Structures are given as C-alpha cells and as structure tokens.
C-alpha cells in the first residue's frame, strides 16, 4: 500500500514487468551479453485480445486497467 506515491507510476512499472515476462526481454538481454543471438525460446505472444486478471481496483488497479485497455486486453477485476 503506497497511498502517497503516484498510482500511474506503479501501474506503468507493473505493465513494464508484464511486458518483460511476456516478451522475454530479460533472457534476450542476458543472451546478447553472452554473444548468443539465437531466437530459440524467446518468442512471446500478443497481449491484444488476451484476458488479464487484476486483484484490487483502487487507484493503482484502475490505472493499470486503463493501460491494459490500451493494449486491447480484456480485464477481469476483483476488489
């Protein structure tokens, strides 16, 4: 719970982490550092049309849901 901090910043960070997991950029970064440019196992998937569950619809949850809608995701929310 961080009521004094920017809900949008937290929601954007959450989306960045979701994209990192989705597109496997953390693995790609490590491979490039090892001079391995193979794409094996690095293909992610599109978020558009996927359903994402959000637990908590306070200020941060609402900001995150707005971002997800921008990516074309369907949202299931629980508060």
Please identify what each model-predicted range represents.
Residues 1-29, 41-44:
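Phosphate/diphosphate ligand-binding glycine-rich loop within oxidoreductases
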Residues 2, 10, 32, 52-54, ...:
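Extended aliphatic helical segments
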Residues 31-39:
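A short, charged, Gly/Pro-tolerant segment at domain boundaries
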Residues 40-79:
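Rossmann-like dinucleotide/phosphate-binding beta-alpha-beta segment
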């Amino acid at each position: 719970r961080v009521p004094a901090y920017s809900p949008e910043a937290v929601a954007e960070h959450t989306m960045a982490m979701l994209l990192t997991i989705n597109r496997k950029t953390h693995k790609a970064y490590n491979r490039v550092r090892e001079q391995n440019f193979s794409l094996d196992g690095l293909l992610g998937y599109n978020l558009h049309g996927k359903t994402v569950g959000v637990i908590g619809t306070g200020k941060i949850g609402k900001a995150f849901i707005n971002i997800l809608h921008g990516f074309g995701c369907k949202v299931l929310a629980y508060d």
